[in-house]
Regions:
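Intrinsic low-complexity, repeat-rich intrinsically disordered segments enriched
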Residues: 1-59
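Extracellular jelly-roll beta-sandwich "head" domains, especially the C-terminal globular C1q domain
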Residues: 38-197
């Protein structure tokens, strides 16, 4: 076994490929070594419904959640103006973790009795990530679901919610910035690519 000491390793051709090891090999990064650069769980984003009045929705209807504010989205992967969806960018294929929070308000009606949350990939609905019946609620309550999706470049993910009960409900939002306590009670979604996928 030998040791190679260098400050920089590059391919012979510009934009070429450098391969370390082959199938079945193990490459070990010793304890205490910091790995920087390309190995990261990006893209990453956190968006929410910024209107404190919320998004008015009809009871029992699977409705796309209009996330219209980026708390952070350094790669610009979430459309907060038109389609309200995440799109996998070039080089971003892999498994993604999503955490969606749905804050429901009964809009002063007769309350709501069941809340569901689901995603759709390329327009096709997935099974519910959250679906629960509750005692009739008239106050704003928060429901959370998590999901891991295997996505390819160009795939887009949309987020939907349903509240059953009175004729109209609201998906509650929160005005203010990152540090506002109301953000914890706001309709939001965070997502990132899992390292190693």
């Amino acid at each position: 076994m030998g040791t190679i000491k260098a400050t920089n390793i590059e391919p012979i051709a510009d934009n070429g490929t450098v391969t370390l090891g082959s199938s079945g090999d193990t490459i070990t990064v010793p304890t205490g070594v910091t790995v920087g650069g390309g190995i990261s769980n990006t893209p990453v984003f956190f968006v929410d419904q910024s209107n404190s009045a919320g998004q008015l929705v009809s009871a029992g209807v699977n409705t796309k959640i209009q996330f219209n504010r980026a708390i952070f989205d350094p790669s610009g992967v979430f459309d907060i103006t038109t389609n309200y969806r995440f799109t996998v960018p070039s080089g971003g294929a892999g498994k993604y973790f999503f955490k969606t929070t749905l804050a429901v308000n009964d809009n002063g009606g007769g309350g709501y009795t069941r809340v569901s949350l689901n995603t759709a990939v390329n327009g096709t609905n997935n099974p519910y990530v959250f679906d629960n019946s509750v005692n009739t609620l008239t106050v704003t309550s928060v429901f959370t679901g998590t999901e891991v999706l295997d996505l390819s470049v160009g795939d887009y993910v949309e987020f939907f919610g349903i509240a059953y009960g009175a004729s109209l409900h609201r998906f509650a939002g929160a005005s203010g910035g990152w540090s506002t306590p109301a953000l914890a009670r706001s309709t939001s979604v965070a997502g990132f690519r899992l390292i190693g996928t």
